[in-house]
C-alpha cells in the first residue's frame, strides 16, 4: 500500500545515529531528496581535493575530511562517508552517513554547518517514519525495531528481531485477508440474493469468523509473555522481618543494594534490581518485612509489599531454617498465591541436620535452602528460579504480542468479531452484520499502519530516538 507522507517530510533531515556524549565514534545520518549534494561542498580528500557527487559509489565508504567554512585551513574532522541512493536505504530516500569522531563540540559544529546549508534537525523517530511512508516497513515492524533498540534481554532482542523480518505482520495480514474474504462472501449474499447463485451460508460465515477469532485469541494469549519480555519477570522476595530477605536480594543481584542489619524492620521501602537469567529480564524486588506494626512509616512499606505480591509474576518466600515454620509464617502463607511461590529456607549455616518440614501441601520442587552468609545453596535458588522461568512458553513463530497498542487493538477487533458472530447466530439482517465486520477489518488495518490515522503514527514514532 502506498502511504503519503506529510509535505514537511520531503525536505532533508539530520540526526545522530549514535548516543550523545563523548565517544570514539559518532555517526551522523542524513536523509532526503538529493541529500548528497548538500553534504559534498564540505567534503575534501585527505590531499585537499574537492569531492564530486559522481565520485561516490553506492554503499562504499570513503575516507574524507569535513571542512568548516569558517576555518577552512584545518579539517574539522576526519571521517568515513557513505552514500545510500534511494530506494536502497533504511528510509527509502537518498541517505548519507558521516562516521566521525565522537567529540560533542565537533558533532555539534558539523550539524550547525549542514543545518545552515538547508538540512533540518530530525524529529524523534523521523527516519523510521520515512521508512514507513516509503514502504520499507509496516507499523508492526517499526515497533519491533524500537523493541530491539530497547531490549533488556537476549530473548526480547531475538523476538523483536524476528518480528522485524515481518513474521508477526504476515500472521496479522493472513487474518485480515480472511476477514476481507468473509466480508466479500457476505456482500455477495446481499448483492446476488435474487440471482441464481448459491451464496455462502450463515453457517459458513460463522465458521470463517470463528477461524479469525481463534487466531486473534491465540495471539492475545502471548501478551503476558510479551509484557515479561518487555518489562521483565517481576520476582518479589517476601517474608517476616529479619529472615534474610535483603541478604538474599543482595546475593542474587550481586551487589549490596539493600541495607542489612539484625534489627527487624530495617527495610521499609521497596528495593529493585534488574537481572538477566536465561535471556529473560528479571525485576527483583526486596520488600519490607510482613508483620503487624504500629509504626505508620513501616505500615506504608508493608502495604506496598502486599501490593507487589499481588502483581508479581513470581514470589520468593523466605523463612529461617533453624526455626522451622512459625505461626507468623503460617499466617503469611495463607495470603500468598502458592502456585507462583518458591519457599527458601535461609540461614543454613545456623542449622544442624536436615531442612525442617514445610507445610504438608507445599510442592517439594518449590523448596530449597540457602545461606546468604556463606553462599551455600545460592546456585540452587537460581536453578529453582530458572525452572520457574522455563515454564514460560517459547514462541518460535514470532507471534508474541509485545506492545500494548497491539494488544489493545486486537482486543477491540475481537469484540467486533464477537458482535458480528452474535448477530449472525441470531439471524439478524446481513446489512447489519457488515458494520462490525468492516470495523474489525479497520482495526487490523490500523494495527499494521495502512491507514491515515496521524495520531496513531505520531504515538508510535515519537517514542523513537532521533537517529531512528
Curated annotation (Swiss-Prot):
The processes (GO biological process) annotated in the record are: tRNA methylation; tRNA wobble uridine modification
Domain of life (superkingdom) = Bacteria
Q: Name one GO molecular function term.
A: metal ion binding
> Might you give the EC number(s) for this enzyme?
3.6.-.-
- Cofactor annotation: K(+)
Where is each TrmE-type G domain found?
A: 232-390
Question: Pfam families from the xrefs?
Answer: MMR_HSR1 (PF01926), MnmE_helical (PF12631), TrmE_N (PF10396)
Q: Which residues bind (6S)-5-formyl-5,6,7,8-tetrahydrofolate?
A: 29, 97, 136, 468
One Gene Ontology cellular component term attached to this UniProt record is: cytoplasm
* Compartment list: Cytoplasm
- Binding-site positions, K(+): 242, 261, 263, 266
Enzyme class, broadest EC rank: hydrolase
| Binding site residues for Mg(2+) | 246, 267
Cofactor note (record): Binds 1 potassium ion per subunit.
KW Hydrolase (keyword) present: yes
Family annotation (Gene3D superfamilies): P-loop containing nucleotide triphosphate hydrolases, Probable tRNA modification gtpase trme, domain 1, tRNA modification GTPase MnmE domain 2
Q: What's the subunit arrangement here?
A: Homodimer. Heterotetramer of two MnmE and two MnmG subunits.
Q: Which family does it belong to?
A: Belongs to the TRAFAC class TrmE-Era-EngA-EngB-Septin-like GTPase superfamily. TrmE GTPase family.
Question: What protein name does the entry list?
Answer: tRNA modification GTPase MnmE
Its taxonomic path starts at: Bacteria, Pseudomonadati, Pseudomonadota, Alphaproteobacteria, Magnetococcales
Q: Gene name, please?
A: mnmE
